[in-house]
Amino acid sequence: MKKLSFLFFLLVASITAFAANVTAGKKAAPLRAAAKMPTFCSETDANPQYYIVTFNRSGTCMSESTNGTDNCIRLYNSTGDASQQWKLVGTQDNFQFVNKNGNYAVVSSESIYTSEGGTNPNPIRASKSAQPGGYKLVVSSCMDNGAGFEVIANSKSGNNYMNLWGDPRGGNTIGFWKVGDQNNVVSFTNPGAMNGALDYKTVGVTGYSPTNMLTLWYDEPATTAQLYSGGQGYSNWMEYALPIGDGQFGASLFGGAYKDEIQFNEKTLWSGTAARSPYGGKGYGKYENFGSVFAEDLSGCCGTTDETAATGYLRQLDLTTATGLTQFTSPEGVTYTRQYIASNPARVVAAHYAADAKGKISMRFTLVPGSVLTSNVTYENEEAKFNGKLDLISYSAVMKVIPNGGTVETTEEGITVTDADEVLVILAGGTDYDISSPTYIANTSSLVSDVEARATAAADKGWRALYDEHLADYASLFGRLDFHLDGTANTLPTNKLIDTYNSGNGDNALMLEQLYFAYGRYLEIASSRGVDLPSNLQGIWSNMVQPAWNADIHSNINVQMNYWPAEPTNLSEMHLPFLNYIWNLAENHTEWKQWAQMQGQDRGWTCFTENNIFGGVSSFKNNYVIANAWYASHLWQHYRYTLDRDYLKRVFPAMLSASQFW
């Protein structure tokens, strides 16, 4: 079976998923984020500090098994119950893990078989007795998923570093492995008032219908929603997060009431090079997760009980305005509204945090690099930034926090805003990728300053001007076509539309079909503007360490499917990043000509099934050489719709060369 293209895949996976007045704080020297050493205690401490112990790569935490069939310490999403709260009894060099149930975490010699990692010879289990020799805590040098620590079992020889066993997407037992593995890294979180829960308790909005009918909406956060797939790890992102994008730079919105995550990507952030690599080879590279902005509520406006729940919770993506929204009301009657856009004119992601009462916004904002990127984040003057280099590509990201009212302080913990009326967050990111350059990179020396300037310009405009500019730009594209099915009304959360669709539930079924059509056009605009690259297998959105098929450009149908809506639905300009990519690689670079020669042809060009953004290919299905003919048909289709003779003169040599291959 052919893999689903991104636009179709995300339609199914995301919809089917329930589918400035600033009082300046201190301006210290640049601060760099680092792992904070947890507090150790003695066995007799009356008020020990407990922690949620989270494996950075999976985001799941140590807990006693809930299946009732074993005594393993397993990994689950945080709920904050007693079995997930651990004190560290002893010293950094010799301590015990003891949870609130009074159980120790010990190294077992009784192996366990797991489908996600095979046989785990020494799983961690719960015991009433201490671990002989205890554990040692060291700062990890592996920062692929953020700063953290590694735990050493002192009495164990050989592989003695505590490790998330098996596939990080589904693994939930703990074993031991070598030093420096990214599955080793853990962090320690103070349960605090949240008691370790992922989010405030929320009660969904009732009797709601969006102002604009073409809106995906939900009555619960993406972080706590029940998964259709039953999967772990990135499934909440895959099934529930809402995508926004300016065509090149985009974000996935989770809508947490307590801790709001804005996970972001940039289309050109790739590891790898232009080489031909073995299937799965490192030289081929992959699409990388750029990182996340976290906005943590410090006001304590809501809580985790029925009495302190956030009510009227709403999370939506308005396709008519390309605006994300999260809204809820606290027990004291204050309504909090958060809006999100990815502005193509400004080339930034912007988030606006507000309340209907003054002085109610108290939050801490942090910038966290993702995937294989540096964890060296610098905080200074209400700004966070990081930059670095992959195999070929250099990258830079900047977050600015601009409060109105209240106070703001920048520390190594992040940017803390207290008692503000509203807060604007600007996020910008970019790389030195340039498809017109023979080396695929250009302007490296100005990258950091260019990204900084973009963020500063957006911050200077302010939220209202940014939003108006964004809306005018987006509406000029999305508003070209109107498709309406009589009798439709958007009165059910999108996941409920999915649930009832197979029953043929009349107007609700038609509403879902109308949303599908609109969502396809929305995604085309959001993932295919700017740089001359097509949207990949996941468009421009990925929170994964290892995305499926590297989130690459698959030429055997997937990238073509991404662009089937472009011309027929009056979005011809969205087709151009794909068409210009074809023209550039066919005419201005050598790689595709080399692949043709590899197939015994003296003329022409071609590419294989799997392609990165540097003209590189993998060895997977490298007998598939007919992509050139299919690509040429896209070049011709655009001319048929636009009758643009200047365009035809430019791309005709690439079409001719493709035919000469045959």
Regions picked out by a protein language model, each given a short descriptive name:
Residues 198-619, 637-639, 645, 656-659:
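Aromatic-residue-lined binding/catalytic grooves and analogous aromatic/hydrophobic interfacial grooves
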Residues 1-27:
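Bacterial Sec-dependent N-terminal signal peptides
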Residues 616-623, 650:
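C-terminal intrinsically disordered extensions
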Residues 625-661:
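Active-site neighborhood of glycoside hydrolase catalytic domains
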Residues 21-199:
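Lectin-like carbohydrate-binding module/patch detector with strong preference for beta-trefoil
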Residues 54, 505, 623:
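Residue-level marker of regulatory loop/turn positions in helix-turn-helix DNA-binding domains and
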